[in-house]
């Protein structure tokens, strides 16, 4: 470990079936080590751990997040990083749901962990994994400050009309029912990067941001602040996702309960794990979906069409909500890598000043870039998200503030 290790932040992003991690210098953005634990709970689980020029891997079943994180710490040791003795600045944790309680980075205590666990009902795929990551990091790195950075925080100040559901007001107040929004760390980072890339004052920008990964969300941002977002009380609402279907008629749930005998747990499993692309096409990996489409699979093609249709519906809604748009940005795994999704989502919108340049859209450039024609009234961009850097900086600021 270098002498500058006291400036480094270990960032943990424990997802529903994965753990992403980076060892980051929050000042320079330099990444000393990084890796990904994939397909947790499946027979073909894998870890890729990168440290400088060296990469090591693990293949074989990883039963749960705890086992995955323990193996990650072993791989750090194998590549010469004694995290326990490194004098890290902090560990920063991405936490999906902060409810009404948390709307800024927070130093982790037992009470904070308990509160995050209580919100698991609202984010059942994510908060339990977040809690596991925090608990294991506290156990493996005692004495290192642990900071929770919440995905809901960016949307805490949504306008009342955007965050309020049209249900009984007393029930909503009693049970904390409102639109919270998610992927806020990414939406805040990317919308800020757009202003930097375009060299424009963010206060003057009207933006629509599509965060398209296994989870997917959209936001409308005016002057650096969100005015609407697609996810709601939970990460189930909005766009079509890998295993979540997004918007649906709530009457479907009552119908399934009466006609098929589905109880709450069965409905929860259906909506969180068996819907979306997986429910329609049998796969939740967009690369696999594309392969099936190329092979002529009709279900996969329909799933893709539903996915794009939902994107266009939110695009239209946010275009009106903003009163026009200056920049439309795609980010996250699908958003950054699928030229087809970007082109199809924005096809035929030239009358609105929205167009994609085919050559720019299919270029192999991995950085932030403009993909609209030079003279287009609306700038379309691809901007890689960097939630890890955003979390590292947030954790560093909190620790520095004492």
From Swiss-Prot:
PROSITE patterns: ACETATE_KINASE_1, ACETATE_KINASE_2. It is found in: Cytoplasm. Its main location: cytoplasm. Mg(2+). Can also accept Mn(2+). CDD domains: ASKHA_NBD_AcK_PK. Signal peptide: none annotated. Catalyzes the formation of acetyl phosphate from acetate and ATP. Can also catalyze the reverse reaction. Belongs to the acetokinase family. It comes from the Bacteria. The record marks 183, 244 as: Transition state stabilizer. The active site is at residue 151. GO terms for cellular component: cytoplasm. ATP binds at residues 20, 211-215, 285-287, 333-337. Mg(2+) binds at residues 13, 387. Coiled coil: none annotated. Its cofactor is Mg(2+); Mn(2+). Its EC number is 2.7.2.1. It catalyses: acetate + ATP = acetyl phosphate + ADP. Keywords: ATP-binding, Cytoplasm, Kinase, Magnesium, Metal-binding, Nucleotide-binding, Transferase. The keyword Cytoplasm applies. Homodimer. This is Acetate kinase. It comes from Nocardia farcinica (strain IFM 10152). Pfam families: Acetate_kinase. Substrate binds at residue 94. Disulfide bonds: none annotated. Pathway: Metabolic intermediate biosynthesis; acetyl-CoA biosynthesis; acetyl-CoA from acetate: step 1/2.
